[in-house]
C-alpha cells in the first residue's frame, strides 16, 4: 500500500478557488505567470505523495471556460536551437508540443509571443509556421535597462514598442518551454499596455515550490533547492512579508531580489502596488493540502538523496560541477540525512560484495527489499526486475519465467548480428521476452499483470546503468539511483 501525504482532490478545489478569488480582486482580468512544469510534474508527485503528475493541468481544466494560454519563447533561444534537457527537443519544437497538448485537453491557446525579438530570421520562419496552423504571433523587443530602468521600461521606447497581445478570457496563463523565456516581462508589458488603454488587469505568479507556508528547512523546500542546485536558487524567509505582516513565509532569492523593482513598477502603473511582498504575488495552495507530514518528509528526504546520487553519476560522466555536489551535501546535512537513509543502497552493495558482480535492489512501498545479481544470461537490473515481478505475483522464487532456450537466441542475435559486446539481456529485452512468453504461459502473464505496481518503488544499482535501462525504469515510474562507477571500468554501456 503506497503511503499518501497529500490530498490531491482538496488541492484541485482550493487552488482553482484561490485563482478565481485573485481574478476577482483585479476586476476580472488576471495575467498568471506559470512557473515549473504544467504537464508531468514528477518532482512534485515524488515529494508530495498523492500529488498527481498532471494535477496542475487538472486544476486549470476547472477554469478552462475562463482561461486562455499564451506561450512565450525567447527569439534568441530559437536562433541557437536551445534544447530542453529533459525532453531532448528544441524550445521551438516544444512550443508546438505544448500547443498540441493544451488543445488536446481542451485548453484554449490564444497566441505565442516571441520575446527578445530583434529581427532574427529563424524567429520569423517560426512565426510563419505558427500562423500556418492558425496561431496568432506577437513580438516583444529587448528593452534597454530591463528590469531596473523604470523610466525607460515604462515608456513608448520600452514596453510601448511591444505588440499588444489580444486576449479574450479572464485568466491569461503565461507559460513557456523553459526558464529565461520572458514570462514575467510579457505579463508586465501587458499590464502597462492595458493601463495605457484604460483597461483593468492584475498579475500573479504560480509556483509550486518553495511552499511558502511550511518551514524554511522543511524537507519539501530543501528538496526544491536540491532540484535547482545547478541554478543556485536559495530558499529564504521573505523579508518583505515579515516586515509587512510579522509572519514568516518562504520564498527564493530571485523573487526576493526582484521584488523592489516589481513593486516600483506596479506603483508606476497602478498608482500603488497591490502587493506588499513577493509571497503576496503567489497563489500557491499546496501547503494547505499536506495531510501527513511524516510521509511527505520521508519522500522529500529520499528525493534529496536521489538528486545527490544523480549529481555524483553526472560528475563521473563529466557532466557535473563539484560545486553542485558540495551544495547537495550541505542540503543533506541540513535535514540530517545520509545515503544510509536510502535502504536499497546497502542491499545492492551487499549483494554486489557477496557475488563480486554488479547487483541491484528494489524496495516496495511496504519496505520489503528484493535484489538481483548478474548472471551469464541477465544483467543485475533485469534479474531484479524478474524477481520483483515474481514476488508481487506470488510466484515461487525458483520458477523460471523465461527459459534459457528463449534467452540464448536473443543473445546470439545481439552479439553476432547487432554488434553488441554485452550478451546479457537489458530490462527492455527482458520485458519483450516476458510479453512473448506470456501468450502461452499464464504464470508469466500473472507476473506481467504486476508491472503497474512497480511505479513509485525505489531502486539502487551498484554500477552506472545503460541509458536503455535508465529509460525503462523511468517509464515504469521507478525511482532509480546508481553508484558513481562503471562495471569493470567500462566507460560505455551497450
Segments from the language model and where they lie:
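Flexible phosphate-sensing "switch/lid" loops adjacent to ATP/NTP-binding sites
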Residues: 1-173, 190-351, 357, 364-366, ...
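Residues at the beta-strand->loop junction immediately N-terminal to the Walker
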Residues: 175-177
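Walker A (P-loop) phosphate-binding loop of P-loop NTPases
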Residues: 179-181
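Hydrophobic positions on the alpha1 helix immediately C-terminal to the Walker A/P-loop
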Residues: 186
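Residue-level structural signal for beta-strand termini and adjacent loop
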Residues: 202, 374-376
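Hydrophobic "anchor" residues
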Residues: 369-370
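A short, polar/charged loop-to-alpha-helix boundary motif
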Residues: 377-393
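Short HxH-centered metal-ligating active-site micro-motif
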Residues: 391-423
